């Protein structure tokens, strides 16, 4: 009798998006569509207590260029015992070094990778796998600063980042983010076909079934999934999600 080999684990990264000192969720990344969920520290500690191994922490004020929650984020990272991926407003050496000095496992570069490819290549060269690049996509067009500007063709930018030696990509379909409409599996399949680097999926995850589908893509190169609104809205619990994703 043959036994099926279990699928590898899909890493889950519960999201904590921060606006004006509060943990919030946005719909399709639009300012003004926030729903507040208490303090970022409470949210992050809650995910840690429920078994998360990662938290995806985003300073949305910094991402939109309207301020910073740096001191608050420092407290959150300092209190957590699990790994943190930090995103939002990392556009120059100073902001990048400050973020890494917090002790996060990795940072996620977004707009900077589109607007300043030379700097991004240098950052990748300096910090290696501590750098992930966030590719926020509408169709195959990249969205830039806070998702409000266009940033070029996905495949052109990916080719450039591959040449620079980027270690990991965080891929968000911005038309699905915060909508609970399901992830863009076709986009993820195309991404892993074009890179040998791990891909983290973001946007649209609405059900445990969605997580099963994403876990089936792990052998192809989808390493993890950022989960936000579905957790906050109670579509499923984090322990349920971790069971589906495969606990270590």
UniProtKB/Swiss-Prot annotation:
Reactions accelerated catalytically: 1-(5-phospho-beta-D-ribosyl)-5-[(5-phospho-beta-D-ribosylamino)methylideneamino]imidazole-4-carboxamide = 5-[(5-phospho-1-deoxy-D-ribulos-1-ylimino)methylamino]-1-(5-phospho-beta-D-ribosyl)imidazole-4-carboxamide
SUPFAM superfamilies: Ribulose-phoshate binding barrel
GO cellular component, one term: cytoplasm
Cellular compartments annotated: Cytoplasm
Residue numbers annotated as active site: 17 (proton acceptor), 136 (proton donor)
Keywords: Amino-acid biosynthesis, Cytoplasm, Histidine biosynthesis, Isomerase
GO BP annotations listed: L-histidine biosynthetic process; L-tryptophan biosynthetic process
Highest taxon in the source lineage: Bacteria
Enzyme class: isomerase
EC number in record: 5.3.1.16
UniProt xrefs under InterPro entries: Aldolase_TIM (IPR013785), His_biosynth (IPR006062), HisA/PriA_Actinobacteria (IPR010188), Isoase_HisA-like (IPR044524), Isoase_HisA-like_bact (IPR023016), RibuloseP-bd_barrel (IPR011060)
Pathway(s) served: Amino-acid biosynthesis; L-histidine biosynthesis; L-histidine from 5-phospho-alpha-D-ribose 1-diphosphate: step 4/9
Listed GO MF terms: 1-(5-phosphoribosyl)-5-[(5-phosphoribosylamino)methylideneamino]imidazole-4-carboxamide isomerase activity; phosphoribosylanthranilate isomerase activity
Pfam (any one): His_biosynth
Similarity remark: Belongs to the HisA/HisF family.
PANTHER family in alphabetical order: 1-(5-PHOSPHORIBOSYL)-5-[(5-PHOSPHORIBOSYLAMINO)METHYLIDENEAMINO] IMIDAZOLE-4-CARBOXAMIDE ISOMERASE (PTHR43090:SF2)
Record HAMAP family: HisA
Protein name per its UniProtKB record: 1-(5-phosphoribosyl)-5-[(5-phosphoribosylamino)methylideneamino] imidazole-4-carboxamide isomerase
Organism of provenance: Arthrobacter sp. (strain FB24)
